[in-house]
């Protein structure tokens, strides 16, 4: 073990007397090469339900590349990704999303002219598969719409945006827009959340609200957090991975 690695405890096991959390996503030997450049080199990690796994490192370390490899936005040169026991390596992002993975991006991805509720409802609809024709489709449609609205309402509530649901997204504050993006992700009912710098550009009060939101989401999800705000990282992280030049140089509990 290197000197850098020795600064992090590797005792990441569950507390005595509590059931071990479930591994929801595993990556083994993930490598991504662009010509002669290795943006990600032999990266392995596990994401557990009920834990927040933070990935830190300088700009260009490979953190966003890793996130894109896990979500399917980039195909790996080598290595495998397993989600909820099924290998998803090489699958399209929309397929991986429907299997239970949601993500946010460094740049907020929302529909600015639409209301908060309309944004979340669109995200909720995106997880739906095409259904065969049904002669009783009006009854089926009513049931379907109720379920869709229930997912939408729950996502808005979890994200703390109940009193903003009818506000046009473009008029929301930066922090609220980041909360909205997470609400849209939650509307797809993911088990695993990949969050790429969710606190970027936030003031103190907005950052505190985001930390509270992530702590609310933690018990039911496996979360990977890419973040430069070290105060937030050490408040939230159960496990910490440090990347430099596409490689993991340290991984363990932040003690």
What are these regions (language model features)?
Residues 2-255:
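Glycine-rich phosphate-binding loops of nucleotide-dependent enzymes
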């Amino acid at each position: 073990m290197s000197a850098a690695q020795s600064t992090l405890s590797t005792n990441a096991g569950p507390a005595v007397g509590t059931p071990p959390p479930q591994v929801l996503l595993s990556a083994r030997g993930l490598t991504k090469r662009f010509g002669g450049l290795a943006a990600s080199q032999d990266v392995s990690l596990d994401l557990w339900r009920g834990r927040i796994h933070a990935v830190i490192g300088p700009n260009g370390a490979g953190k966003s590349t890793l996130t894109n490899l896990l979500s399917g936005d980039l195909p790996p040169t080598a290595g495998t990704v397993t989600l909820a026991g099924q290998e998803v390596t090489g699958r399209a992002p929309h397929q991986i999303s429907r299997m239970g993975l949601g993500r946010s991006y460094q740049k907020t991805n929302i529909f600015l002219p639409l209301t908060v509720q309309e944004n979340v409802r669109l995200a909720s609809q995106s997880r739906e598969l095409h259904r065969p024709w049904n002669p009783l489709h009006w009854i089926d449609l009513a049931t379907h719409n109720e379920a869709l609205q229930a997912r939408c309402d729950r996502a808005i509530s979890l994200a703390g945006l109940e009193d903003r649901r009818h506000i046009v997204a473009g008029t929301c504050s930066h922090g609220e827009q980041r909360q909205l993006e997470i609400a849209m992700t939650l509307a797809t009912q993911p088990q695993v959340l990949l969050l790429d710098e969710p606190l970027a550009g936030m003031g103190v009060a907005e950052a505190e609200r985001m930390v509270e939101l992530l702590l609310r989401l933690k018990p039911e999800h496996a979360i990977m957090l890419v973040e430069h705000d070290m105060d937030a990282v050490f408040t939230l992280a159960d496990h910490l991975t440090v990347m430099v030049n596409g490689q993991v140089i340290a991984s363990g509990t932040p003690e």
